[in-house]
Amino acid sequence: MEVILLERIGRLGQMGDTVKVKDGYARNFLLPQGKALRANEANKKKFEGQRAQLEAQNLERKNEAQAVADKLNGESFIVVRSAGETGQLYGSVSTRDIAEIITADGFTLHRNQVELNHPIKTIGLHEVSVSLHPEVQVKVMVNIARSTEEAERQAKGEDLTSIEAIYGIEEQPLSEEVFDDEDEAEDQA
């Protein structure tokens, strides 16, 4: 099905472009969301008549998103989850969790605006991309830890998945004195 885009949509095109998309994508997403019109003569004329108004609305939404992006850019958010000794989470942190944490901090964000290829399953600092508008993206830091104290240590650059961090001991190779010589082992046998 051919549609006329009413706003910029990533991987499809700019506002006003006529693109061919799968019927289901058009019927179930683009048309109900008001992001596109069917590409016929009547809708082409309607779009051209409203083009200036649509561009003004798009610019306004972009400016609002840019204002939020300026506040959000470089922010760090702490997520406390239970995890094993090696840093593997018991569960995962998904786009929904990240959106809830950012929203709790006073920003308006939906989970589909958080771009995450796969759920986060380890503690540590993770950079996450947030798309506030098709033309405005921002990166935030998500600090996943077992406690707020651990999150503070991670923020300072400490690796909490090492033996030293887990058990509070320094990693040292065992000296030769600890091992018995093979000759002594044979004498005792």
Swiss-Prot record:
It comes from the Bacteria. Coiled coil: none annotated. GO terms for biological process: translation. Keywords: Ribonucleoprotein, Ribosomal protein, RNA-binding, rRNA-binding. GO terms for cellular component: ribonucleoprotein complex; ribosome. GO terms for molecular function: rRNA binding; structural constituent of ribosome. InterPro entries: Ribosomal_bL9 (IPR000244), Ribosomal_bL9/RNase_H1_N (IPR009027), Ribosomal_bL9_bac/chp (IPR020594), Ribosomal_bL9_C (IPR020069), Ribosomal_bL9_C_sf (IPR036791), Ribosomal_bL9_N (IPR020070), Ribosomal_bL9_N_sf (IPR036935). Pfam families: Ribosomal_L9_C, Ribosomal_L9_N. Binds to the 23S rRNA. PANTHER family: 50S RIBOSOMAL PROTEIN L9. NCBIfam families: L9. Belongs to the bacterial ribosomal protein bL9 family. This is Large ribosomal subunit protein bL9.
